[in-house]
Amino acid sequence: MSTANGDLISSLYPPPPVYVKFFTTENLNKLQEWQRQQNDEEIETKQEEADDKDEKDNEKQNETQDTVPPGELRFLVPPQPPSGTHYRGYGNIWSFEDKLPSLKSANWEQLYKDDDESITSETKIKELHKLMDSLLLNFLELIGLASIDPSQYESKIKDISLILININHLLNTYRPHQSRESLIMLLRKQIDAKRASINQVEKVCSEVKQKLLKLTNIQDVYKKDSIVLPDNSDNSPMAENAESIKDEIIKKLLSEH
């Protein structure tokens, strides 16, 4: 039975809890009514507070007990955040502070001098090169030791694992920088895409303007010759000629596409 409960706690997507069935409309209405009564009682108790410290402590204890709804209603109230610096969820222990733990806090030897918060990017690069050189050297020593006395391999394996842990920890310190750079790259791609769409719209607008100018060139021709272009309602030969020219221009533009 305990094994089944352990698998249930550490499963990735556990089944819904039993108290889900208590979330009904009737219970929600009861909870609202109970909360109204609690607010009225809190206002009355604040007006009748005593100066004695012991009485205040007793009142606080009573208040904490009274703030829990009775019966099934207590399952409808969100729980208070857990106290301390860590909490348990999905079978694992998590920290409230989203911070990379140091090697010392994990009981591992730190092979570089500076702290994670004060170390600079240039120092990280230098330390990574040193750790890589040490890793290659220890690997060669392990090969030589295996050819002479294979039973003494354990110490070298521990040294190599310690170097790899330090390398992995230094690389993990780059995670915030990697997140910022990834966000910058994403924003740049979005900006480039929007600029490309804007340029495409401007290009289409310029093409439309040029085609409209071609259509209005006939107006400029008549203006240069000091000839007033008659209205479309006029049935004179000049108006008919102008209309025919416009029709030819429109047909030419349509034939291009």
UniProtKB/Swiss-Prot annotation:
The subcellular localization recorded is: Nucleus
Per the database entry, which stretches of residues form a coiled coil?
Answer: none
Q: Give the Pfam families listed for this entry.
A: Med7
- Aminoacyl-tRNA synthetase: present as a keyword of the record? no
Which Gene Ontology terms of cellular component type are present? core mediator complex; mediator complex
Q: Where is this region: Disordered?
A: 33-74
Biased composition regions of type Basic and acidic residues, renumbered to the chain: 44-63
One of this protein's GO BP terms? RNA polymerase II preinitiation complex assembly
One annotated GO molecular function: transcription coactivator activity
What the protein does? Component of the Mediator complex, a coactivator involved in the regulated transcription of nearly all RNA polymerase II-dependent genes. Mediator functions as a bridge to convey information from gene-specific regulatory proteins to the basal RNA polymerase II transcription machinery. Mediator is recruited to promoters by direct interactions with regulatory proteins and serves as a scaffold for the assembly of a functional preinitiation complex with RNA polymerase II and the general transcription factors.
Share what the entry says about its subunit structure, partners included: Component of the Mediator complex.
> Which family would the database say this protein is a member of?
Belongs to the Mediator complex subunit 7 family.
User: What name does the UniProt record give this protein?
Assistant: Mediator of RNA polymerase II transcription subunit 7
- The scientific name of the source species is Scheffersomyces stipitis (strain ATCC 58785 / CBS 6054 / NBRC 10063 / NRRL Y-11545) (Yeast)
The root-end lineage is: Eukaryota, Fungi, Dikarya, Ascomycota, Saccharomycotina
